[in-house]
């Protein structure tokens, strides 16, 4: 199984760690062979290629991981025209000034696509999604807060749209039967916080609707602490209000918590579900990449074992739909 990583920076090295971990665990019956494309050769024993075209011809990968900087996604994806393997792509798909339709068309020959929205792979996410479906809950209200500190970060970025995508996706993925997402109001802040320029979107607040449900949210790259929360209010089939509170990566990476409850007329609360993934993985091979390993194993299952995508998988159609939403947010911010 040949896997090509395009861009061996921060994100690319995370993917490398995830696939190497699965290989060391003997996840497949055959070894994984990894190679990379990068502007410069790194201190790795992996096969290095200076160009994507050279790598596609010489290495013949079954999986291509696109983990270059945001601004270079479109260029790499366009170079994959005619490629017939499986593509794994970091978010966002492209930037607002790229030709989205041309990018989508360039990927018409691929056998599969996996978008890196790893919060879907958390136990709290899949558990809540199944609970919503089993209980027939209807979303009334959603709110999110999604931020972290990227001030003076050396990694280039397209801005806060790269952060808000996680919350936008989770809301729609958790509640797929509510209807279409419609953006109503947007407020944004542009600053020189990033090495990418003097006018990069650092913060955005939105109000929107998902079907008839109101969804509000705030996302920022100038949050001084990592803060990733979703709050949801549902109506049950009997008319009771059901509340869900999700916290991701707090206090450490991959430590997620979910609480679901209902409140009675007298104010008393009844716990319906509590889930915590607070195992401390600091110092282990899975530190900061536990959910990413789940995504990578899903990809290997699809490509090697020909399994259908898991419930958590985000496909190309999802990536394009989210990109259209991000483009509108950036245009109106």
Placement of each model-derived feature along the sequence:
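Beta-loop-alpha module in the N-terminal Rossmann-like domain of NAD(P)-dependent dehydrogenases
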Residues: 47-106
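C-terminal helix-rich "cap/oligomerization" subdomain common to oxidoreductases
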Residues: 27, 63-68, 289-333
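A structural signal for well-ordered alpha-helical segments within the folded catalytic domains
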Residues: 9, 13, 74, 122-126, ...
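N-terminal Rossmann-like dinucleotide-binding module
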Residues: 1-44, 58-59
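Alpha-helix termini
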Residues: 20-30, 53-60, 176-181, 302-307
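A contiguous active-site-proximal alpha/beta segment in oxidoreductase catalytic domains
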Residues: 94-154
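NAD(P)-dinucleotide binding in Rossmann-like oxidoreductases
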Residues: 214-294
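Rossmann-like dinucleotide-binding domain that binds NAD(P)(H)
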Residues: 151-231, 317, 321
